[in-house]
Swiss-Prot record:
<keyword id="KW-1003">Cell membrane</keyword>
<keyword id="KW-0813">Transport</keyword>
<dbReference type="InterPro" id="IPR050107">
    <property type="entry name" value="ABC_carbohydrate_import_ATPase"/>
</dbReference>
<dbReference type="Pfam" id="PF00005">
    <property type="entry name" value="ABC_tran"/>
</dbReference>
<dbReference type="GO" id="GO:0016887">
    <property type="term" value="F:ATP hydrolysis activity"/>
</dbReference>
<dbReference type="InterPro" id="IPR017871">
    <property type="entry name" value="ABC_transporter-like_CS"/>
</dbReference>
<keyword id="KW-0677">Repeat</keyword>
<keyword id="KW-0547">Nucleotide-binding</keyword>
<dbReference type="InterPro" id="IPR003439">
    <property type="entry name" value="ABC_transporter-like_ATP-bd"/>
</dbReference>
<dbReference type="InterPro" id="IPR003593">
    <property type="entry name" value="AAA+_ATPase"/>
</dbReference>
<comment type="similarity">
    <text>Belongs to the ABC transporter superfamily. Ribose importer (TC 3.A.1.2.1) family.</text>
</comment>
<comment type="subunit">
    <text>The complex is composed of an ATP-binding protein (RbsA), two transmembrane proteins (RbsC) and a solute-binding protein (RbsB).</text>
</comment>
<keyword id="KW-0762">Sugar transport</keyword>
<keyword id="KW-0067">ATP-binding</keyword>
<comment type="function">
    <text>Part of the ABC transporter complex RbsABC involved in ribose import. Responsible for energy coupling to the transport system.</text>
</comment>
<keyword id="KW-1278">Translocase</keyword>
<feature type="domain" description="ABC transporter 1">
    <location>
        <begin position="3"/>
        <end position="239"/>
    </location>
</feature>
């Protein structure tokens, strides 16, 4: 199958979001689609799959004009879109999810479970994975749920598969499994549109790359004929010569101390962070980094150990006590744990500091609005106003709202768990710059990141975890990818 999207444009009211877009999609090819959040990538794919119509232009499939009325019609034609937020029902089994709305019935109108099981088993065999058809989706890992979504595509003679940030929540092993599946699909002649911000993935698995910016296609070329610097320059419209901004903070006295922290997930964790310091936490998935931070913040209970701020021991049994002590925690899952998507920007930012705006028993909305406006401007949150629903913002702007929420409590220590996950190149740099500004004001920062170049580029010092223990610390001079990975895999 060959698809040609020609001169596609799209406007929502007076707001033009796509203009004169040309995009070729070929069978047996992995085509990367890159661009900052808001560039128009998802809008273009939603037009292709029939979620809404284009305002202009045409789509040709094998040289014939074709427009889909809805995503179901596109799926019937062999074109599937796996969104970043997966379309599964957690309380239903794998089999029920696969055939929801496309049930197979016998001549008497009764569900033909045997036929559905046979078809589902065949789909997973084609993917080279084994998944229990009777298990509830909610009990599967994110990687397994993703395989269910891909298997669902196989039920309709898959020809084109669109994947939006597919590795954002996967472990390293699940990511490699996905890459293996993509290679298999490519060998079968399936065309794949791969939307991602992760440069290393683009150069590892894609054949060509299209860069979008502000609703326009900037360039399309073979992946092997470009490089990271060129792609970044085309995505943001300027050269980012220094991807990680220079840090000028003075590192001073110890502010935060953790001594011999233990739970069932980690043992005897001890470290300290100084005023103005960014301490990175590296390690493989499952090493225990997030679990340590959740315990420090009072989400999970410590079995033993001591937490100190400015030399004073703290009792932290819940997040409220952690916030009162001056600890801010940006969690790795911003949508489920960091934000209330149905709340406004203002309501989200003021959540942990609501008491500061209550005077004589009443909430001072005017003061809160001014406070939120100032924070939003400082963090360059792109929104219509502070009353806009957070769920309607781009990933980068949502992350800035979470950061604003914790900056708003004037933290004595700030914990950031995967702060740039699912965030575009321009927003990443803004977050790095903000971290530097906080460090310059003396805030100690603890940053978990699975992106090795990021942690090497941002952290002053790195703690590397392996199987629930700190395997070692590396200073700026010692920190290389090789040294980090050696400690992360249990080497000395």
């Amino acid at each position: 199958m060959k698809i040609e999207m020609k001169n596609i444009s799209k406007s929502f009211g007076t707001n033009k979001v796509l203009e004169a877009i040309d995009l070729p999609i070929n069978s047996g090819e992995v085509h990367a689609l890159m661009g900052e959040n808001g560039a128009g990538k998802s809008t273009l794919m939603n037009i292709l799959t029939g979620l809404f119509p284009a305002s202009g232009g045409e789509i040709e499939i094998d040289k014939e004009d074709k427009t889909f009325k809805n995503p179901q019609e596109a799926e019937g034609f062999g074109i599937s879109f796996i969104h970043q937020e997966m379309n599964t029902w957690p309380d239903l089994t794998v089999l029920e999810n696969l055939f929801l709305g496309r049930e197979i019935k016998n001549k008497f109108g009764v569900l033909d479970t045997k036929a559905m099981r046979k078809k589902a088993t065949f789909a997973f065999e084609q993917l080279g994975v084994t998944i229990d058809l009777d298990k509830e989706i909610g009990n599967l890992s994110v990687g397994q749920q993703q395989m269910v979504e891909i298997a669902k595509s196989f039920l309709s003679d898959l020809k084109i598969l669109i994947m939006d940030e597919p590795t954002a929540a996967l472990t390293e092993r699940e990511t490699e499994r996905l890459f293996s599946v993509i290679a298999g699909l490519k060998a079968q002649g399936v065309g794949i549109i791969y939307i991602s911000h992760r440069m290393e993935e683009i150069f590892k698995i894609t054949d060509c790359v299209t860069v979008m910016r502000d609703g326009l296609v900037i360039d399309t070329k073979k992946t092997k004929e470009t490089n990271v610097d060129e792609l970044v320059r085309k995505m943001v419209g300027r050269s980012i010569t220094d991807y990680y901004p220079q840090k000028n903070a003075e590192i001073r006295e110890i502010v935060f101390e953790a001594e011999n922290l233990s739970t069932a997930d980690f043992k005897n964790i001890s470290f300290s962070v100084r005023s103005g310091e960014i301490l990175g936490f590296a390690g493989l998935m499952g090493a225990g980094r997030t679990e340590v931070m959740r315990a420090i913040f009072g989400i999970d209970k410590l079995k033993s150990g001591t937490i100190k701020i400015n030399g004073k021991s703290l009792t932290i049994n819940n997040p409220a006590q952690a916030i009162k002590a001056g600890i801010g925690f940006l969690t790795e899952d911003r949508k489920d744990e960091g934000l209330v998507l149905d709340f406004s920007i203002k309501d989200n930012i003021t959540l942990p500091s609501t008491k500061d705006f209550i005077h004589h028993g009443l909430f001072d909305d005017k003061t809160a609005t001014t406070f939120v406006k100032q924070l939003s401007e400082r963090l360059n949150v792109k929104a219509t106003d502070e009353e806009q629903m957070v769920g309607s913002l781009s990933g980068g702007n949502q992350q800035k709202v979470v950061l604003a929420k914790w900056i708003g409590i004037a933290p004595k220590v700030l914990i950031l768990d995967e702060p740039t996950r699912g965030v575009d190149v321009g927003a990443k740099r803004e977050i790095y710059q903000l971290m530097n500004e906080l460090a310059e004001r003396g805030v100690p920062i603890i940053m978990i990141s699975s992106d090795l170049p990021e942690i090497l580029g941002v952290a002053d010092r790195i703690a590397v975890m392996h199987e629930g223990k700190i395997a070692g610390f590396l200073n700026k001079k010692e920190a290389t990818q090789e040294n980090v990975m050696q400690l992360a895999t249990g080497g000395k």
